[in-house]
Curated annotation (Swiss-Prot):
Name by which UniProt lists this protein: F(420)H(2) dehydrogenase subunit D
Bilayer topology term: Peripheral membrane protein
Matching Pfam families: Complex1_49kDa, NiFeSe_Hases
InterPro entries per UniProt: F420_dehyd_FpoD (IPR054914), NADH_Q_OxRdtase_suD (IPR001135), NDH1_su_D/H (IPR022885), Ni-dep_hyd_lsu (IPR001501), NiFe-Hase_large (IPR029014)
Signal peptide: none
GO molecular function, one term: reduced coenzyme F420 dehydrogenase activity
Reaction catalysed by this enzyme: methanophenazine + reduced coenzyme F420-(gamma-L-Glu)(n) = dihydromethanophenazine + oxidized coenzyme F420-(gamma-L-Glu)(n) + H(+)
Source organism, top-level taxon: Archaea
Subcellular localization(s) per the UniProt record: Cell inner membrane
GO biological process, one term: methanol metabolic process
Physiological role: Component of the F(420)H(2) dehydrogenase (FPO complex) which is part of the energy-conserving F(420)H(2):heterodisulfide oxidoreductase system. The membrane-bound electron transfer system of the complex plays an important role in the metabolism of methylotrophic methanogens when the organisms grow on methanol or methylamines. Catalyzes the oxidation of methanophenazine to dihydromethanophenazine. It shuttles electrons from F(420)H(2), via FAD and iron-sulfur (Fe-S) centers, to methanophenazine (an electron carrier in the membrane).
Entry's EC annotation: 1.5.98.3
Length: 374
């Protein structure tokens, strides 16, 4: 983009603060009229140094740190981190604790998708969509808050279990919220399908093929919108997902419309998963019996070794590689977030399109800049 420009070309910098972005980053565009001729993404505006911070905190303190990788999906960040430590300790949470984790992580998936849908509607001029989704999201956050004591950054999971059991009356308060959300999802689809402008701004726009997605390491709804049925909850089940009945939602078009549809369908599956968990959850302890692990686990030394653990984040594959040297804090934690590979697909997708379509394409990826700049 640094070569000489033709007389009808110009460089435009979008960001680092721009209403259509999911967080601070700069998108440098080379334009000829309204057509994008070249594009590059510039990151690093909110780098937090989380991987280095984890090396200087005890394992228990690290739970609070990984919440900040992306506060929207703090529970799946915790699941990935805690899962690594549990592998090193060679322990498994009791069945009740596993069901509680799944319930909360699926509630987290619902609120994340609701926010993503609302923001996308706002990006493409469908402002009322944000008002609808944010209202439903509040109900989900209230349920999460009821269990964890926080709407975001929960610090709820513990090695071998969860901090607290489900409160009394949780099931009775959850079922009406889920039933209402089922109807609301149908309403969203009717709004989308009946809106000509929405269809024109999404169908056939920003098409990503399955081969392109796999070559870039894209995962999550963006990958499944290309027809690839890969979901870690199915392909490499963790917790009690292997005992639950749910579908991997896919579309084949690979465009903005398909990406939104995958998320809508995934919300239905998350509701179904939560309903199964509420019916199947057994009584019992929330920590392994006969072990020192509990709500206030003392400073502990984790056996030396190295592990990799990955989970299905609302945006794709969240993985962590952890190395222990036998001390009370990790020697190294390498985080593999879902949005960084997805962001690599943005420049090639928007080259040759218009600025207006660029906003639609970028928004359909449902990004989290905080996770990229960890």
């Amino acid at each position: 983009m640094e070569e000489m420009l033709e007389s009808n070309e110009m460089i435009v910098h979008l960001g680092p603060q721009h209403p259509m972005q999911p967080g601070p980053f700069r998108l440098n565009l080379k334009l000829k009229g309204e057509t994008i001729m070249d594009a590059e993404v510039e990151m690093g505006y909110i780098h937090k140094g989380i991987e280095k911070i984890l090396e200087n905190r005890t394992y228990l303190q690290g739970i609070t740190i990984v919440d900040r990788i992306c506060y929207l999906v703090a529970l799946t960040n915790e699941e990935c981190y805690v899962g690594c430590v549990e592998k090193l300790l060679d322990i498994e949470p009791p069945e009740r604790a596993q069901y509680i984790r799944v319930i909360l992580e699926e509630l987290s998936r619902l609120q994340s998708h609701l926010l993503g849908l609302g923001e996308y509607g706002e990006f493409i001029g469908f402002v009322s969509m944000f008002m609808y989704t944010i209202k439903e999201r509040e109900d989900i956050l209230t349920l999460i808050d009821m269990v964890t004591g926080a709407r975001v950054t929960h610090s709820y999971l513990r090695f071998g279990g969860v901090r607290d059991d489900l409160p009394e009356g949780f099931k009775e308060k959850t079922i009406p919220v889920l039933n209402k959300l089922k109807k609301v999802i149908r309403d969203y689809e009717e709004m989308f399908y009946s809106d000509t402008i929405y269809r024109e701004r999404t169908i056939g726009i920003g098409v990503l093929t399955a081969d392109e997605a796999k070559s870039l390491g894209v995962s999550g709804p963006v990958l499944r919108a290309t027809g690839v049925p890969f979901d870690i909850r199915k392909n490499e089940p963790y917790l009690v997902y292997r005992d639950l009945d749910f579908k991997v939602c896919t579309e084949t078009a690979g465009d903005c419309f398909a990406r939104v549809q995958v998320r809508l369908n995934e919300m239905r599956e998350s509701i179904y998963i939560i309903e199964q968990c509420l019916d199947m959850i057994p009584n019992g302890p929330i920590f392994p019996e006969g072990t020192p692990y509990g709500k206030r686990t003392p400073v502990m030394r984790v056996p030396a070794g190295e592990v990799f653990h990955r989970v299905e984040d609302p945006r794709g594959e969240m993985g962590m590689y952890m190395v222990s040297d036998g001390s009370d804090r990790p020697y190294r934690v390498k985080v593999r977030g879902p949005y960084y590979p997805t962001l690599q697909a943005l420049p090639p997708l928007i080259i040759g399109t218009t600025v207006a379509d660029m906003v639609s394409i970028s928004g359909s990826m449902d990004g989290c800049t905080s996770e990229v700049d960890r």
